[in-house]
């Protein structure tokens, strides 16, 4: 099927964030990992579909694809430390920060990978079907 031929695979991931002083580094790292996983899901997998009456068609885990552990690479996470001056602990928020840059980074990587085929745009999520369609459309434009 298309999923095998047009498989997208994230093979490496590095992130660096500034959360000020880290009160509990293990919890912060978990938040970053969760955010990255969420961003990968948004960019490559998670796709809601509705029927003509507005009924959600992807309402179960059988129909709505989310990342599993085997969809994700190991994450390399680093931190800079610029303490916040607005609170006594010098901390900043870290909840799901990894989800901010993940989708555009992945979509740009997909477009870069497909650029030799003439693909210049890709909407999220970059499912195998959307990758196939983008390739077909770029090839039909090139043939004109």
Residue ranges of model-derived segments:
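Glycine-rich phosphate-binding loop
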Residues: 1
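C-terminal catalytic domains of large/alpha subunits in multi-subunit enzymes
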Residues: 4-144
């Amino acid at each position: 099927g298309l999923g095998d031929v047009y498989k997208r695979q994230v093979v490496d991931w590095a992130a660096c964030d500034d959360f000020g002083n880290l009160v509990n580094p293990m919890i912060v790292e978990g938040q970053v990992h969760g955010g990255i996983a969420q961003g990968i899901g948004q960019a490559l997998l998670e796709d809601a579909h509705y029927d003509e009456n507005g009924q959600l068609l992807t309402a179960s885990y059988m129909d709505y694809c989310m990342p599993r552990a085997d969809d994700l690479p190991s994450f390399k996470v680093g931190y800079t430390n610029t303490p916040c001056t607005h609170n006594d602990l010098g901390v900043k928020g870290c909840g799901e920060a990894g989800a901010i840059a993940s989708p555009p980074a992945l979509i740009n990587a997909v477009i870069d990978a497909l650029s030799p085929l003439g693909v210049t745009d890709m909407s999220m999520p970059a499912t195998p079907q959307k990758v196939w369609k983008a390739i077909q459309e770029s090839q039909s434009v090139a043939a004109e």
